[in-house]
A protein has these predicted regions:
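N-terminal low-complexity, intrinsically disordered segments
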Residues: 31-48, 93-94, 98-101, 146-159
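Short amphipathic beta-strand starts and helix->beta connectors
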Residues: 59-62, 112-113, 219-223
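Non-catalytic, polymerase-adjacent accessory regions of viral genome-replication enzymes
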Residues: 1-65
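Active-site-proximal segment of RNA-dependent polymerases
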Residues: 83-136
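Short, flexible, solvent-exposed loop/turn segments with mixed acidic/basic and small polar residues
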Residues: 63-67, 116-119, 226-227
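Alpha-helix initiation and N-capping motif
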Residues: 21, 41-45, 83, 87, ...
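Conserved polymerase palm-domain catalytic core
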Residues: 121-231, 235-257
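Glycine/proline-rich, flexible active-site/cofactor-binding loop segments
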Residues: 62-105, 174-192, 199
């Protein structure tokens, strides 16, 4: 959707000034009016409290599995209608506050998989990396930490830091995921992570991956390559081959990822 400058300025101003839960609620309701019009029924403080507190709302998500093209299963966690509406408003706020890295092609307004492919047109060599379990690899602690840094800056006071906790909780869901243990083996653990199925997860994943994009774009520049990322699909391309096993390029990429 197209946003006018007034809406963008107002969202940024309200976000920058908010210090209390009531002010955050007012911001969500302003975003709701932008999305649904003046007749949109505003969220109440009790609704906000209910949806950001997992122990109060134990049915925040419904989980089900779908088949991937590979035949493996992908777990979808669909938020209930109330939480989903809040997440849609929150997602609009994220998109206004944060400017995606130029290398990010997925989940970005005005960009598509075609734009991702155009970056690499004409190059002779293409190297792809698929990030495993993309959304669930991002846990609530990382979301909270990212919200405390620019451009969100929810670390400027104790009250704003508490808002970072609320927003991170609205974005994440506790579920069983795989993590590497100290021996390098994958084990099942329960973590609060970005769920596949929440409206906020795509945008937040780009926000979290901003540092990754900066570092990988830097590697690409040093080796004379093109770099882009479409969601969990990382692509490098070039006119020369630097992708051999044990190459300096691959070693550097592995250190980052």
């Amino acid at each position: 959707m197209e946003l006018d400058k007034k809406h963008i300025k107002s969202i940024r101003t309200l976000f920058g000034k908010m210090k209390t839960k009531d002010e955050f609620l007012a911001l969500l309701n302003y975003a709701k009016v932008i999305l649904y019009g003046e007749k949109a029924i505003p969220f109440s403080i009790s609704q906000l409290n209910y949806h950001y507190t997992p122990k109060a709302n134990r049915k925040r998500y419904i989980q089900f599995a779908i088949k991937k093209k590979s035949g493996a299963e992908r777990i979808i966690s669909a938020p209930n209608n109330g939480l989903k509406e809040i997440q849609k408003c929150l997602n609009l706020i994220f998109q206004i506050i944060h400017t995606p890295n130029p290398a990010a092609m997925g989940f970005v307004n005005g960009k598509s998989i075609v734009d991702n492919a155009k970056v690499h047109v004409g190059n002779h060599y293409v190297y792809n990396i698929d990030l495993k379990d993309f959304f669930p690899s991002i846990d609530q602690a990382r979301v909270w930490g990212r919200l405390r840094n620019a451009p969100f800056n929810l670390n400027e006071s104790q009250k704003r830091s508490e808002l970072a906790n609320i927003i991170a909780s609205l974005c994440c869901h506790e579920m069983e995921v795989e993590r590497l243990d100290d021996s390098g083996s994958f084990v099942k653990v329960v973590k609060s992570v970005l769920p596949q199925g929440a409206p906020t997860s795509p945008t937040m994943s780009n926000i979290i991956c901003e540092r990754l994009d900066i570092r990988l774009a830097g590697v690409a520049k040093r080796f004379g390559l093109k770099y882009s990322r479409y969601a969990d699909d990382i692509t490098f391309s070039s006119m020369h081959n630097v992708y051999q096993k044990e190459s300096d390029f691959l070693k550097e990429v592995e250190r980052i990822i």
